[in-house]
């Protein structure tokens, strides 16, 4: 006996949606063995891919000629995951042997999935250093579907400056319709099909197929719908969608269905019961509140007419009616497939109190496709009204709660102009015929327009939110950190108090060197989303700067226990051992992070800094160059190269690399400070002072900038100005031995020996063990007159060694060295 394709497909998607990947793979293999079709091939490859076996999906699809857009896209996705970028590009856009496809060609070929295809192609272009082409693909993808976030995020990360106001908007109604899957169209039953009895060739229900009737087809998400081979389809296609049918076969499955009384409260989109903690508002005003005495509006159906969708465009059928007495809708953008409730169509709530016009569910994936769209895979098999349903009628009826009597409600015309008939306690509707339509004067245009307007309003609300988040993220990627903090802090509280938003704010504080604030924000992220790994590498570096070894140890332990395949976890572990000056162990952990994700630029940068601490400068250079190869806009790597060249006294190269980092992050006072020091080393003292002044304007309390400006003033024999600068610096870092040592040098030049000796003594008291040998050596010889003794190059003030080898433990002392070491 030939395996029926549709019920098997339904079972496979049921298993996939319940994460039973082994079962899904097994059934998909059986289906593909039975039916060698592109559809079965795609379904099997999807099972492999979702179960984490991308290589299996790749080899399966590679071994067969993929002609459908779904197979091509999945094969390209596998290629990208397996780092076969050239092959993935050829599949999507053609190659050397094929004609290169334009964006319009891709849109024509891939249809609704073109936005995802272009986003994937843009990723390939960016990974192969063709940023201009990648940018075009991302922009086209966003123009097709402004609901996508990752293309916008990628545009910001490659240095583009997309306008969120122009990106997250609908350019036309067609653009709005294309953004939504076919299943998001509002349902309105068509009375013209109410008497249609679908025929079936299945005259008997075998015992082994009864269990198939028990499948909860609501879990089959409509976005996975495939074109079904007509030769395998035995049942009429113009019947109800499985999204509206929870159990069983035929129209009798809706008999004696009971709907719960909607709770009184604010109604946003689909009736009084629609409001829940999961109901997004997205800027939509709540409708009027129903009175506490509302009836339950229950209705029992013994022979419910089939339900279809009204197309999004074109005039509705004259006999289309609004179904009476449905429960409230699920929340907007809710996931289908996890509920056994019957999907509501159009709920109208009546009460003696304030009149409430409840509206259809909006943008919910649980609503069925329009009639002009292809039916779902399994929609035809489970909707027969033949004798096969009688065998299971008793069993099916037991799955519903007992019938609850309805309360009487008056017939009243609501704001939408829809008149509903009286509902009696014992009323059972067997048929909606033309007499009901003519007597009730039911209008179909108003609910459709109302539903569409609410759909668009909900989408516009989301667009408004994305615009604000986009502005904040764009400002952060442009390193306008204060602006980013201001924008993101004004988001609604329920969006502000989420891990993603708080991580961006914490990163902004980190870039501003406000480590205490960053630590506060990241600790809040850990409290509300202790499962979040993304962004924790920045948190670990923040704790490294603050020298909070206990908190850093706890963080690294938790992250590595939670996800050993996360580069962020190993970066945190490396920072933990780096803080303990266990540099060899830290290097191993950073190398492990690179092994887990070879495209993780931050791990290369941390490893490079660690090699600098162990004086392995050649290895450090290689690490920083690899970080730049992975991400050319990773300014920390450019800074690391400049720091190494400075240590090697290659000042021109150092200035060039520092300047490159500054071009990426023009708001960094630390980078300006280092450029000023290099300029002074190149005998450009006046230019160096100007650069340091700019750095202090950006961050007036940056101790590193003030210390270097005082040092340059001292070297230029401007002793009084240097002394004034150092006195201000002493208020910021009162326990920094270097400050007192330089003050002593100034007093010595001014001839005030007793004050010089006093400050030298304080410097030694702050560093009694001599861990800071720079008290005698760290002031660069270029800062000193010719009569001063030379010092060794290794102990220059710019070196990272002093920040790690310093004996400072107080929080005030760490500010100078934390900022001085590097920004990471």
From Swiss-Prot:
GO process terms (BP): anaphase-promoting complex-dependent catabolic process; cell division; metaphase/anaphase transition of mitotic cell cycle; neuron projection development; protein branched polyubiquitination; protein K11-linked ubiquitination; protein K48-linked ubiquitination; protein ubiquitination
SUPFAM superfamilies tied to this protein: TPR-like (SSF48452)
Basic residues composition bias: residue spans: 395-413
Ranges of Polar residues composition bias in the record: 326-341, 362-371, 380-390
A GO molecular-function descriptor: protein phosphatase binding
Pfam family, one: TPR_8
Subunit and interaction comment: Homodimer. The mammalian APC/C is composed at least of 14 distinct subunits ANAPC1, ANAPC2, CDC27/APC3, ANAPC4, ANAPC5, CDC16/APC6, ANAPC7, CDC23/APC8, ANAPC10, ANAPC11, CDC26/APC12, ANAPC13, ANAPC15 and ANAPC16 that assemble into a complex of at least 19 chains with a combined molecular mass of around 1.2 MDa; APC/C interacts with FZR1 and FBXO5. Interacts with RB. Interacts with FAM168B/MANI. Interacts with MCPH1.
Protein name as catalogued: Cell division cycle protein 27 homolog
Taxonomic lineage of the native organism: Eukaryota, Metazoa, Chordata, Craniata, Vertebrata
Gene: CDC27
